[in-house]
Regions:
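Short alpha-helix carrying the canonical HExxH Zn2+-binding catalytic motif
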Residues: 171-185
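Alpha-helical and His/Cys-centered functional microenvironments
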Residues: 8, 13, 42, 186
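N-terminal, motif-rich segments that launch catalysis or mediate targeting to/interaction with membranes
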Residues: 26-175, 191-287, 291-333
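N-terminal secretory signal peptides that target proteins for export/translocation
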Residues: 1-9
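Bacterial N-terminal signal peptides
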Residues: 13-26
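Intrinsically disordered, low-complexity segments enriched in polar/charged residues with Gly/Pro
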Residues: 8, 20, 168-169
Length: 333
């Protein structure tokens, strides 16, 4: 008969094995920009919200800043289903989809294309699984859609002279949540198979150790960068012509900076106080995240004046003009 001590020994052994398995199979670093970077991106963007947008958002800077790291709070192994489902939301390996241009705007069409590619690939077909490729632009556009829908509801409630406190809370949540992904995409290592150590031909001798990702976005940013360092780089928002296409262009631009991260690491740029070159690079990447976030908020607000709920009657030129007039009125409240 097993004793209590032997059962306890086996139980502890099982816990150790489980933790080892988790560490072995964890494929991606736990966060982008760390808690500080994501908080700073959201704060800087919120402080730049124009007066043409609702006043309650301009008063919610602290709440929006707090929500910057929120999706990283969903990545604990103690909430397995949550962690597992949203792990691919934080990255996209653009090298794996270089054959697919343009990327489809819909998540499920993207899945279909990947599975077709996987079926036709003999060598490492699982590289084309959606969870391996990453789904970063799709979650971003889905949260953007939630924000736009909430803005639309806010407009309708205001026009009907009904309370708006509940939808204001939803808008703040979606705005902060969206900020996380806009920030992720500004970190070049979230766009590449070289996300945590150089892979492939390496004539320049870049690091292959699995630590560059966290050293860059975590301890280095926390110790050396503050929101005020990059806030002046963020300008007034601009309306995006095509949010999805513009966001993909932003991701691709970020991916062009991957080698620069490795060059800076090789030069000791992320050790201790780092180097002036690393500081300049990092502040510009954080500013790019805040600028993109601000542009997304602004575009969602403007588009919500035109967007209609499902089964709504078509909008005429007259009602569209009326909506634009209401938009200017609502912004001051």
């Amino acid at each position: 008969m097993a004793t209590h001590g032997s059962f306890e020994h086996r139980f502890r052994g099982l816990i150790v094995l489980t933790l080892i398995a988790f560490l072995l199979f964890e494929s991606r670093p736990a966060a982008a920009w760390g808690n500080e970077g994501h908080t700073y991106i959201n704060r800087v963007a919120a402080e730049k919200i124009p007066t043409s947008m609702p006043l309650f958002m301009r008063r919610a800077v602290d709440e929006i800043a707090y929500l910057g790291p929120e999706p990283d709070r969903w990545r604990s192994p103690t909430e397995f289903a949550l962690k597992n489902s949203q792990e691919p939301d934080h990255f996209i390996d653009l090298e794996r989809v270089s054959w697919l241009d343009p990327l489809p705007a819909g998540r499920y069409e993207f899945y279909r294309k990947l599975y077709e590619k996987r079926a036709a690939t003999a060598d490492h077909p699982d590289d084309y699984l959606p969870e391996r490729v990453g789904l970063q632009p799709y979650i971003t556009m889905e949260v953007y859609g939630r924000l736009k829908a909430a803005f639309r509801e806010y407009r309708q409630l205001r026009a009907a002279h009904k309370p708006t406190a509940a939808v204001e809370q939803a808008i703040i949540l979606y705005a902060g949540w969206l900020g996380h992904y806009a920030g992720d995409a500004s970190q070049p290592l979230h766009t590449t198979i070289k996300y945590n150590g150089w892979v492939g031909p390496n004539p320049n001798g870049y690091t292959t150790e699995h630590k560059i990702h966290w050293e860059f976005e975590g301890p280095y940013v926390a110790a050396n960068i503050h929101a005020t360092d990059f806030a002046p780089l963020v300008k007034a928002p601009e309306r995006l012509n095509d949010p999805f296409a513009d966001y993909i262009a932003y991701l691709k631009d970020s991916s062009t900076q991957v080698e620069r991260v490795y060059q800076l690491e090789k030069a000791g740029g992320f050790v201790g106080q780092g180097t002036p070159e690393a500081f300049d690079f990092t502040t510009h990447r954080l500013a790019a995240g805040a600028q993109t976030l601000l542009n997304l908020w602004y575009t969602a607000w403007l588009e919500s004046a035109d967007a209609m709920p499902e089964h709504a009657p078509p909008r005429t030129a007259k009602t569209k003009a009326q909506a634009q007039e209401r938009s200017a009125t609502l912004a001051i409240h």
